[in-house]
């Protein structure tokens, strides 16, 4: 807008003066007052834009974090619910203390994995996009323009890092539907007595319990979907 460009002009030392000076040219006084008002409105517009940008960014960050957390923790919640249902069934129809203790141990194992996942999610920060940040800074005229070649090189480096991160992420996916990058501490060699049992082992033990109790095949189908 033309008035924004005019308001951004820097006044020289000789342009400063009292807007109420009776001996000054009226057109010059009006121009100074107009420039002062426009500069104030530009600053107010920047402040309003920053506040609005913060609100949008916070909401987007919350939505992304909630979606990521829900995707990771959902299967653990379903598994915990299935084990809790089996525990209730055993209390009502079967007083075998061995099975009850085994289910309680599996619930504890799920809790360990959930605790690690939640702790790891809190430490995750989204990667910064160098090109976007530079463009934003240039739009605000807060620094000198960065050469195009340098921006291209930085963008290539950023894409290379993102591709490597995506490759590592894809390699860590588990067949059970749970991202193994969040549950490294849940891997184990001795499943039965490990301090950090894996989700796959918990699912196998739960399916074995379902067969041992002679429950419906639908429960096994439900476990296969986790």
UniProtKB/Swiss-Prot annotation:
The keyword Metal-binding does not apply. This is Protein YAE1 homolog. Its main location: cytoplasm. The complex LTO1:YAE1 functions as a target specific adapter that probably recruits apo-ABCE1 to the cytosolic iron-sulfur protein assembly (CIA) complex machinery. May be required for biogenesis of the large ribosomal subunit and initiation of translation. Pfam families: Yae1_N (PF09811). It comes from Homo sapiens (Human). One of its GO terms (cellular component) is nucleus. Keywords: Cytoplasm, Nucleus. InterPro entries: Essential_protein_Yae1_N, Yae1-like. It comes from the Eukaryota. Transmembrane segments: none annotated. GO terms for biological process: protein maturation. The gene is YAE1. Forms a complex with LTO1. Residues 45-85 are annotated as: deca-GX3 motif. It is found in: Cytoplasm; Nucleus.
């Amino acid at each position: 807008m033309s008035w924004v460009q005019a308001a951004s002009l820097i006044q020289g030392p000789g342009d400063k003066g009292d807007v109420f000076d009776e001996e000054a040219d009226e057109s010059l006084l009006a121009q100074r007052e107009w420039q002062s008002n426009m500069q104030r409105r530009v600053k107010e517009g920047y402040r309003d834009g920053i506040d609005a940008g913060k609100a949008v960014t916070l909401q987007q960050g919350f939505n992304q974090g909630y979606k990521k957390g829900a995707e990771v923790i959902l299967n653990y919640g379903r598994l915990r619910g299935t084990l809790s249902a089996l525990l209730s069934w055993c209390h009502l129809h079967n007083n075998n203390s061995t099975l009850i203790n085994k289910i309680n141990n599996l619930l504890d194992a799920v809790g360990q994995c959930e605790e690690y996942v939640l702790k790891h999610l809190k430490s995750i920060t989204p990667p910064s996009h160098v090109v976007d940040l530079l463009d934003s800074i240039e739009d605000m005229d807060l620094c000198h323009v960065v050469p195009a070649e340098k921006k291209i090189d930085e963008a290539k480096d950023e894409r290379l890092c993102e591709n490597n991160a995506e490759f590592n992420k894809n390699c860590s996916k588990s067949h059970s539907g749970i991202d193994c990058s969040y549950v490294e501490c849940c891997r184990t060699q001795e499943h039965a007595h490990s301090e950090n049992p894996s989700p796959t082992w918990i699912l196998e033990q739960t399916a074995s319990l379902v067969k041992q109790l002679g429950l419906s095949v639908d429960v096994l189908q439900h476990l296969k979907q986790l």
